[in-house]
Amino acid sequence: MTELDKDTFDQAVLAHKGVYLVDFWSETCETCAAMMPEIETLERELAGEHALAGKVAFGKVNLQGNRRLAIREKVMSLPTVVVYRDGEKVKAFSKEFTASEVKAAVEGLLGG
């Protein structure tokens, strides 16, 4: 999963053609720490599914030092996972959600 910050986000995510999943998190967020392995597993699962391999990119933004970016992207609670398609936000998951819900949304966008 690519580490993103205020200097790399626009080029990596907003200029990306296709689906990009971004995990907004913080070191002080216990729920974020619990969810991170599930999102990393989801990344491996989607990379391993032949039909979806290479069709979705993954990144994460630590809010430490990136609060303005989070505010700009309307991330108001943690953890938050945002799904972008062709640089546009299409779906956001906040606080209580499962990796399965995120996977279903990504597969829906990819027709998988």
Language model features with spans:
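A short beta-strand-turn-helix
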Residues: 2-19
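Short pre-active-site segment immediately N-terminal to redox-active cysteine/selenocysteine motifs
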Residues: 17, 25-28, 77
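The canonical Cys-X-X-Cys-His
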Residues: 29-32, 81
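Typically the conserved alpha-helix immediately C-terminal to a functionally engaged Cys/Sec
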Residues: 31-48
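Structural microenvironment flanking redox-active thiols in thiol-disulfide oxidoreductases
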Residues: 61-70
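A short glycine-leucine-enriched loop at secondary-structure breakpoints
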Residues: 72-76
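Non-catalytic, surface beta->alpha helical segment in thiol-disulfide oxidoreductase systems
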Residues: 77, 82-112
